[in-house]
């Protein structure tokens, strides 16, 4: 049955307008983006099939162009559109974070880092550079790694802190495996960075590890 034949209250677009985007499932939100179905399937049917094929929204958003275009009814134009929407979402969160006078709690930082790092297929190490009032100066990806890890060099981190004239820093990296639990190596490199920055009176406020739908804060665990 075509979506146009559904009751108005069940059509994704009408449902969003009436009840807000939070009321829609992943498939319904994706269907609005897709706009049309194909080969006898409605946009919602196609969206459900895509989510099933990729194993969920996270994997779909993280897919490269080749993998994405193998999906039924999808091509480069849809891939470009989806990446543009994803990037706008990241930038929106980034602007929101920058406009805060200071960080009220770690949750807003986790939300931002989730948006920036969760969908990456390889591990990256990043930092939020802050002024003396804990306002954001810059968010930088410092090191890129493989699926297994990213090499982190304290000397380069120090250079970045000085370049931004940062008074404090929050480190972050992702675990492409989806498991956010920090490793012993994560704790060791954090200790090394803390010691290096202490010599310059730069505070390490937190190190957040981003997994799939979860983020672990070193500060919340009392490790800093």
Curated annotation (Swiss-Prot):
Residues 102-224 form the MPN domain. The keyword Transcription does not apply. GO terms for biological process: proteolysis. Keywords: Hydrolase, Metal-binding, Metalloprotease, Protease, Zinc. The keyword Protease applies. GO terms for molecular function: metal ion binding; metallopeptidase activity. Coiled coil: none annotated. A motif (JAMM motif) lies at residues 173-186. SUPFAM superfamilies: JAB1/MPN domain (SSF102712), RuvA domain 2-like (SSF47781). Zn(2+) binds at residues 173, 175, 186. NCBIfam families: PRK00024.1 (NF000642), radc (TIGR00608). Belongs to the UPF0758 family. This is UPF0758 protein TERTU_0184.
């Amino acid at each position: 049955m075509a979506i146009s034949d559904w009751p108005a209250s069940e059509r994704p677009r009408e449902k969003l307008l009436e009840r807000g985007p939070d009321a829609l499932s992943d498939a319904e939100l994706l269907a609005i983006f897709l706009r049309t179905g194909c080969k006898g399937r409605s946009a919602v049917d196609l969206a459900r099939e895509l989510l099933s094929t990729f194993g969920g929204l996270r994997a779909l958003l993280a897919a490269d162009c080749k993998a994405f275009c193998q999906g039924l009814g999808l091509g480069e134009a849809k891939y470009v559109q989806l990446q543009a929407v994803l990037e706008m979402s990241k930038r929106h969160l980034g602007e929101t974070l920058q406009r805060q006078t200071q960080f009220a709690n770690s949750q807003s930082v986790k939300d931002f880092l989730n948006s920036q790092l969760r969908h990456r297929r390889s591990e990256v190490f990043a930092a939020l550079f802050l002024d003396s009032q804990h306002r954001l100066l810059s968010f930088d990806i410092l090191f890129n790694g493989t699926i297994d890890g990213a090499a982190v060099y304290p000397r380069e981190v120090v250079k970045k802190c000085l370049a931004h004239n940062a008074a404090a820093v929050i480190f972050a990296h992702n675990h492409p495996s989806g498991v956010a639990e920090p490793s012993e190596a994560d704790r060791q490199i954090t200790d090394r960075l803390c010691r290096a920055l202490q010599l310059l009176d730069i505070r390490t406020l937190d190190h957040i590890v981003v997994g799939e739908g979860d983020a672990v804060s070193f500060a919340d665990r009392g490790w800093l």
